[in-house]
Amino acid sequence: MTEPTQPNAAPQNAVELDDNQIIAERREKLRALREQGVAYPNDFRPTHHAADLQTEYADADKDALETKALHVALAGRMMLKRVMGKASFATVRDGSGQIQFFITPADVGEATYEAFKKWDLGDIVAAKGVLFRTNKGELSVRCTELRLLSKALRPLPDKFHGLADQEMRYRQRYVDLIVTDEARKTFVARTKAVSSIRKFMAEADFMEVETPMLHPIPGGAAAKPFVTHHNALDMQMFLRIAPELYLKRLVVGGFERVFEINRNFRNEGVSPRHNPEFTMMEFYAAYTDYKWLMDFTEQLIRQAAVDALGNAAITYQGRELDLSKPFHRLTITQAIQKYAPQYSDAQLADGAFLRTELKKFGVDATQPAFLNAGIGALQLALFEETAESQLWEPTFIIDYPIEVSPLARASDSVDGITERFELFITGREIANGFSELNDPEDQAARFKKQVDQKDAGDEEAMYYDADYIRALEYGMPPAGGCGIGIDRLVMLLTDSPSIRDVILFPHLRRED
């Protein structure tokens, strides 16, 4: 038995041909298949998966497999092919992994063997046969039946170079998943992380719910919404920027622990950390506060890492990070002074000094969001310039100013701040939570201030939501709520530098 000696060699000589010529040749092969009968059959049913066989029989030697004589049926995409006289090999990948097919005319018949020679990389093929181990130790299927299930008309990228164009990887994710192992691993890890979160929430007695994606009033976050029109109702609608106000309505209604994992939409810029459509998990729990939320969020993220990766100790962009260790907690001013110790307490309490300092960082203090900004908002802006990117280890930044936290409960002990936190890991915001404001009169007053800011030109300021105020007037129990960015969390867990790496089909400019 002769086996391939270069299992990773470039596919045939097709890479040297023009793609259009290759496609034309493959269309001609498809035309011939149509003339022979059903070109795309759908009557083959696999009995096994490649990864299961590789795992179960990893330690089985040739003799053991020969004695067992396990009959299998597998199907998948042909990734490698070697035609070598009277014996040929094909590496086939299914949804779980890959396995080698061993094909001879004596086993499958001369006609099938000759047909196989004309098949191309990327074709979906199927085989029945007996599991065995080759002389070189490769677990393989000795094919007794071999079929072509789906003809691939376009060639796969060169095995060695793959999809070198990063944008092409995002635009043609279906090809990226075929040829890039890391891409497949990333999205498997994403699914495991989300499943872990759902399990964690269920075990903590949270109920998963679904709230509207089309809102009559955008609310729950400071952001620019996408605007659309409902024809039948003849009314303007907004794609949701956050589910928060609807979830808290459910807390009013008596569902004391609720959560939702779904998409939010924000009509803003695109960056390695931002996509206009992104996935968030928000949860609300009656009779809790922001301190409870921090403990709970820390446990949730740690468990998601373990379930997705098998370990809470990870590596991100070449640096180690241990999510099993307790997360840090700092106030905004503590964080500034930790990473920019040149600032004194007196300077951080001086509005004029802060405005001058922010100008040095290129922050326009005359923009609407800063025109009437108090000390707290200015401190937050300085924090974003000096400390935020330095927060590599998991750190809760706590006690946010009330003027930038219109939905959070005010502190009982310190004027001007709220019981709010944001969680940063590797310099990125991962979560935002707070003790909920359940005083309807206070909430109404804060909404009015937001309206004033919007009238002054702040496009991200919130609208006044009269129905939400009405809901609060029925009485909402004290509660805590938190939002976790699923995409950013998955970036962290999969060592992905861009949010586009963890979204299957990220938004891109139109193709020319």
Curated annotation (Swiss-Prot):
Catalysis performed (reactions): tRNA(Lys) + L-lysine + ATP = L-lysyl-tRNA(Lys) + AMP + diphosphate
Protein name: Lysine--tRNA ligase
Binding site for Mg(2+) 2: 429
Recorded GO MF terms: ATP binding; lysine-tRNA ligase activity; magnesium ion binding; tRNA binding
One Gene Ontology cellular component: cytosol
HAMAP family, per database record: Lys_tRNA_synth_class2 (MF_00252)
SUPFAM superfamilies: Class II aaRS and biotin synthetases, Nucleic acid-binding proteins
Oligomeric form and interacting partners: Homodimer.
Family the entry assigns: Belongs to the class-II aminoacyl-tRNA synthetase family.
Gene source species: Paraburkholderia phymatum (strain DSM 17167 / CIP 108236 / LMG 21445 / STM815) (Burkholderia phymatum)
Superkingdom of the organism of origin: Bacteria
Protein EC: 6.1.1.6
Cofactor remark from the record: Binds 3 Mg(2+) ions per subunit.
CDD domains attached to this UniProt entry: LysRS_core (cd00775), LysRS_N (cd04322)
